[in-house]
């Protein structure tokens, strides 16, 4: 995220922002129980670095009751930031369907949307695109050699940013079909779509597959916490020694 974008959108006083948690409440509690900040907490911390005069509401769109309360009031928000999750969108659970449905409601009312990792996958799906399991591997802690496209280099989000950069990242899935009229902003060897920009409804959406809001310290904590899943379920890493070398 570049200085021009920060100055335009995050340093204005009294902005009303809605921050959405991508994980289920149960998953969020698992994070908190082991001392790892939730994705929403990481987002709020990052935002406070740029601007302490923001009015931030936090929502978990997995909960139907939350959605009924907030949908009539969405127009009050200047922007939406939607964070990461351990969910896979093709699993099509009720919690995932609620998130997609709520994103569609946001497209009717909120003009600026920053959708990060899972958030981008929800936004893309809600706008008619498609997300599948990644075919070129996964990111476990870091995305290396993210390259801006020409369109990315002239987009406000990346103005004056290095054309090649690394970022914290943790994902197993990827966007395979973008929404109509989407502009491809960045890629790397793992994910063709590392970031994109598109418009739908009243919204402008910037979608990122990587995690600019998460510190490497938190990523290391997540990797250690997820080691059993990474080894036995995801089968992305052979053993604990390999995890230690990876870190």
Feature locations, PLM:
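Pocket-forming structural segment of enzyme catalytic cores
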Residues: 22, 129-217
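Short loop/helix-cap segments at secondary-structure boundaries that form the rim of catalytic
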Residues: 71-75, 122-125, 176-179, 197-198
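Hydrophobic/aromatic beta-strand patches that form the interior of the parallel beta-sheet core
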Residues: 18, 57-59, 81, 114, ...
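N-terminal beta1-alpha1 cap of cysteine-dependent amidohydrolase-like domains
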Residues: 1-109, 233-247
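Short, glycine/charged-enriched secondary-structure capping and boundary segments
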Residues: 32-34, 94-97, 127-131, 182-183, ...
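C-terminal helical/coil "lid" or tail adjacent to the Rossmann-like core of SAM-dependent
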Residues: 212-247
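Cysteine-nucleophile active-site neighborhood
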Residues: 77, 85-151
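Short glycine-/acidic-enriched loop or helix-start segments at secondary-structure transitions
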Residues: 29, 91-92, 124-126, 179, ...
């Amino acid at each position: 995220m570049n200085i021009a974008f920060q100055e335009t959108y995050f340093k204005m006083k009294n902005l009303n922002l809605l921050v959405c948690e991508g994980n289920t409440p149960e998953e969020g509690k698992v994070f908190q129980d082991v001392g790892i900040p939730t994705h929403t907490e990481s987002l709020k911390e990052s935002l406070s670095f740029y601007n302490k005069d923001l009015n931030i509401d936090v929502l978990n769109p997995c909960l139907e009751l939350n959605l009924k309360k907030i949908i009539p009031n969405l127009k009050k928000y200047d922007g939406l930031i939607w964070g990461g999750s351990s969910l896979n969108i093709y699993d099509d659970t009720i919690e995932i369907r609620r998130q997609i449905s709520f994103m569609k409601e946001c497209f009717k009312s909120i003009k600026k949307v920053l959708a990060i990792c899972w958030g981008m996958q929800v936004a893309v799906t809600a706008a008619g695109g498609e997300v599948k399991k990644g075919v070129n591997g996964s990111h476990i802690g870091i995305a290396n050699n993210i390259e801006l496209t020409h369109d990315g280099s002239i987009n406000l989000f990346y103005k004056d940013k290095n054309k090649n950069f690394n970022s914290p990242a943790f994902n197993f899935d990827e966007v395979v079909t973008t929404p109509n009229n989407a502009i491809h902003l960045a890629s790397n060897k793992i994910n063709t779509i590392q970031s994109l920009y598109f418009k739908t409804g009243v919204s402008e959406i910037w979608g990122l597959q990587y995690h600019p809001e998460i510190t490497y310290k938190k990523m290391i904590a997540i990797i250690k916490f997820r080691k059993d899943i990474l080894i036995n379920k995801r089968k992305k890493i052979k053993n604990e020694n390999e995890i230690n070398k990876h870190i």
